[in-house]
From Swiss-Prot:
Residues 142-203 bind DNA. Ventricles of the heart, developing feather buds, retina, hindbrain. Regulates the chamber-specific expression of myosin isoforms by activating the expression of the ventricle myosin heavy chain-1 (Vmhc1) and suppressing the expression of the atrial myosin heavy chain-1 (Amhc1) in the ventricles. May play a critical role in establishing chamber-specific gene expression in the developing heart. Residues 221-232, 254-269 have a biased composition (Acidic residues). This is Iroquois-class homeodomain protein IRX-4. Residues 282-294 have a biased composition (Pro residues). The gene is IRX4. Keywords: Activator, Developmental protein, DNA-binding, Homeobox, Nucleus, Repressor, Transcription, Transcription regulation. Belongs to the TALE/IRO homeobox family. It is found in: Nucleus. Residues 234-253 have a biased composition (Basic and acidic residues). It holds the Pfam family Homeobox_KN.
Length: 485
């Protein structure tokens, strides 16, 4: 009869000798062999081994009975699956297990008489495979984690009762308690944390608090970690206490930055305007400009007018150069008026305001002119008019004279200095003055006006015949406008 629950294809013959004589050798001849060896196995040499004592056999029998009862060596992992390799020791293995026939008859079935076949087969557990017949591998109930019971926690309660003044076990004490109670180290730490929390709620604290930072909130940490957490919380509290002063310092820094931004914006706005040298006959000893508040009002007004004139000259100089190039390189187009300044061309942004050239040219009130246009009007008019004309007559001169005075004031006479248009305008002005003098002397209004018109036509015709390759500037009509953009 074989026992498939062990996985060994052995017969019911006993495997251990029951003799108490330790000196009697066990001699065997070529007897039975295992089925794996085959029927034609050669005869084996006898092997001598000491006989086991009864106390060793009793212990082994007890362990085999417990292992069979647990069913951990069931049939699914029998000999065909390779489990029998643990008891196979090469080609001479049958010599160890083949017994004498007489001893087999005398003690038949005595070794496994108390073993009953297993009712069910359990799966193979790998964690116990390395312990074949070891008592620690077969007994797995006490080594596994289980819930804490009253029997296990009684030891912890006794330790807590003895250490009411300091219920914080060290790491070594926790390990010792875990071994005694068969609990894990985490379970022991959690139990003590819960016990301390429960005592605090019941107002049964008999120990001083640890800086208001106990391990109830962190039941899985050790004392060293708790102390580190306490130090970190203290550092955080000190940082929070220092936060208001830090905020005030940041606000002060921001206010300083705002002041710097305001100063930079003011300086950038001031840089948009071109600086003008301050004409002062007596500078200060320190080298700085004198204060403007000390100047008289009239001097301040004159200085502002001069600055405006300088700005106007700086704005109109490039436009004058373009106009001169256009007049010298263009072809004659009859009596069409050519605009010297394109309407869409923008001037510099530093110009204080925009003037209308048509309004300035046709205006008879020189008080409306800007200061830059009135600077050289008197001198240029005296140079242009050859005949002696009084101041009252100059205000009532022809439009050519007004336009010439305005052009001289703006362009400083760079354009009409060496051109035929300059001569034509001068002749026209002289003829206009002569005609007006004849009107005043004779009183014949109609004939004088006719003679004046004929003279003007003749002068214009002579101008066209003299230089037909250059343009002349015609007078704008009543509805036309000239722009300086």
């Amino acid at each position: 009869m074989s026992y498939p629950q062990f996985g060994y294809p052995y017969s019911s013959a006993p495997q251990f000798l029951m003799s108490t004589n330790s000196l009697t050798p066990c001699c065997e001849s070529g007897g039975r062999t295992l089925p794996e060896s085959g029927p034609a196995a050669p005869a084996q040499t006898p092997v001598y081994c000491p006989v086991y004592e009864s106390r060793l056999l009793a212990t082994a029998r007890h362990e085999l009975n417990s292992a069979a009862a647990l069913g951990v060596y069931g049939g699914p992992y029998g000999g065909p699956q390779g489990y029998g390799n643990y008891v196979t020791y090469g080609t001479e293995a049958p010599a160890f297990y083949s017994l004498n026939t007489l001893e087999a008859k005398d003690g038949g079935g005595s070794a496994h008489a108390g073993i009953s076949p297993a009712a069910a087969y359990y799966p193979y557990e790998h964690s116990l495979s390395q312990y074949q017949y070891d008592r620690y591998g077969a007994m797995d109930g006490g080594t596994r984690r289980k819930n804490a019971t009253r029997e296990t926690t009684s030891t912890l309660k006794a330790w807590l009762q003895e250490h009411r003044k300091n219920p914080y076990p060290t790491k070594g004490e926790k390990i010792m308690l875990a071994i005694i109670t068969k609990m894990t180290l985490t379970q022991v730490s959690t139990w003590f944390a819960n016990a301390r929390r429960r005592l605090k709620k019941e107002n049964k604290m008999t120990w001083p608090p640890r800086n208001k930072c106990s391990d109830e909130k962190r039941p899985y940490e050790e004392e060293e970690e708790e102390e580190e957490e306490c130090s970190q919380e203290d550092a955080m509290k000190s940082e929070k206490a220092e936060e208001p002063t830090g905020k005030e310092e940041k606000e002060l820094e921001l206010s300083d930055l705002e002041d710097l931004d305001a100063a930079e914006s003011e300086s950038s706005e001031c840089e948009m305007r071109r600086p003008f040298p301050h004409p002062h006959p007596h500078p200060l000893p320190g080298g700085g400009p004198p204060p403007r508040a000390a100047e008289p009002p009239a001097a301040a007004a004159e200085e502002e007018e001069e600055e405006a004139a300088e700005r106007a000259r700086g704005c109109l100089k490039p436009a004058a150069e373009e106009c001169e190039a256009a007049l010298l390189g263009a072809r004659p187009r009859g009596c069409e008026a050519k605009l010297c300044f394109p309407q869409g061309q923008p001037l510099l942004e530093a110009k204080p305001r925009i003037w209308s050239l048509a309004h300035t040219a046709t205006s008879l009130n020189q008080a409306e002119y800007p200061s830059c246009m009135l600077k050289r009007s008197g001198g240029s008019a005296a140079a242009a008019v050859s005949a002696p004309v009084s101041v009252m007559d100059r205000h009532q001169d022809s439009p050519v004279t007004n336009l010439r005075n305005w052009v001289d004031g703006v362009f400083h006479d760079p354009l009409f200095r060496h051109s035929t248009l300059n001569q034509a305008l001068s002749n026209t002005t002289v003829s206009w003055a002569t005609t007006k003098g004849a009107i005043l002397e004779t009183g014949a209004l109609g004939r004088s006006v006719g003679n004046g018109a004929n003279v003007l036509k003749g002068q214009l015709a002579n101008l066209a015949h003299q230089d037909s390759s250059k343009e002349f500037l015609a007078f704008p009509k009543a509805g036309s406008k000239m722009f300086c953009s």
